[in-house]
Amino acid sequence: LWGPKVMIINGRAGSGGDLMPYLFRAKGVGPLVGTNTWGRLVGTWDTPPLIDGGSFVAPRGGFYDVNGEWAVEATGVAPDIEVRNNPAEVLAGADPQLEAAVAEALRLLETEGIELMAEPEAPVRYRRPGGGR
């Protein structure tokens, strides 16, 4: 829980995978590393069943931000640090996005450090008969 946080994102993330990095950035938790998210953050509702027993869903709701502006849908969330994973490198065992995210977390750790909160006094969860602890 302590120390810098970095989130890896890419185009394989949509829906909640779009919303989470959006909120991560909005709350100032830390930088986003990778590539743009997919950009599909809509609400869907089921429709009545089809005569053959099949079904489908249709998008009916969008996402707008605290300023009342439509956000994320069709644009996704862009990274703060763009790093692409080359398939040949990944097949060879490398993970450039992970490596960049770890490097950024270590850089933030060195430049910003960690400020630990004081531990609160332990709660009293029981009382002995006669009022003793």
Give residue spans per PLM region.
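C-terminal "post-core" interaction segments
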Residues: 1-133
